[in-house]
Swiss-Prot record:
A GO BP entry: wybutosine biosynthetic process
S-adenosyl-L-methionine in keyword set: yes
EC number of this enzyme: 2.1.1.282
Its biological purpose: S-adenosyl-L-methionine-dependent methyltransferase that acts as a component of the wyosine derivatives biosynthesis pathway.
Protein name: tRNA(Phe) 7-((3-amino-3-carboxypropyl)-4-demethylwyosine(37)-N(4))-methyltransferase 2
NCBIfam families tied to this protein: PRK04235.1-2, tRNAMtaseTaw3
Gene assigned in the entry: taw3-2
Pfam families: TYW3 (PF02676)
């Protein structure tokens, strides 16, 4: 699969450059070692403070702070000092994985796997003749905090929003072990991909990461 080769090259380069969320590297390696599937953009889950120039204007938004672990109240409060323009939100988002399957049968297996792992927003669609499965959970939080540099909530509200956002992040990340276990079972069923191990050697992945 030419597309898988390109996706793996992109992933391994990003790993070397420190641009991949560390707590899902093992899982990404596992998924990509499976024959007939590969990952594209994925995230281990995150929480942070973001400015959006207008509702839904994601391309022009600016993160004031973004972390892939529970955030501290003081971190959030300090980040708000850098707010300038737009609507200010605290956002908590669950892990998300985009996985491409080479055929409809594998896409269906991935869809069932995501749902069985507790990722209830898992869907799949056909894009440019590719079967793309989005493994996604339900724990999303968007809490408005202010506008145009003005924080319109008190510390009590901010602390509460941070607490709820962190709890949602922990809960969604807590499903990752089950997801990994189910992908291991899928690998036993579908087999491993020689291309993956070929590129592992080319990019010297074993020097820094243990293969699943």
């Amino acid at each position: 699969m030419k597309a898988k080769r390109e996706a793996l090259q992109s992933l391994f380069t990003a790993m070397r450059d420190g641009k991949v969320d560390g707590d899902i590297i093992d899982l990404l390696l596992l998924i990509n070692s499976i024959k007939g599937i590969y990952t594209t953009s994925s995230c281990s889950g995150r929480i942070g403070i973001i400015e959006e120039p207008a509702l839904g204007a994601k391309p022009l938004s600016r993160w004031l702070i973004k972390v892939h672990r529970p955030i501290e109240f003081e971190e959030a409060k300090e980040a708000l000092k850098n707010a300038k323009e737009g609507i200010i939100f605290l956002k908590s988002q669950p892990p998300i994985f985009h996985v491409v399957a080479e055929d409809l049968e594998k896409a269906r297996k991935l869809h069932e796997l995501g749902l069985a792992s507790g990722f209830k927003y898992t869907t799949f669609k056909v894009i440019s003749k590719r079967y793309l499965v989005e493994i996604n959970a339900t724990e999303y939080l968007t809490a408005p905090l202010g506008r145009d540099g003005r924080v319109l909530v008190d510390d009590g509200y901010l602390r509460f929003a941070v607490e709820i956002g962190n709890e949602m992040l922990r809960r969604s990340k807590g499903r990752l072990p089950r997801l990994e276990e189910n992908f291991r079972r899928l690998r036993e069923e579908l087999g491993t991909d020689e291309l993956f191990y070929e590129l592992v050697e080319e990019y010297k992945i074993r020097e820094n990461w243990e293969l699943p």
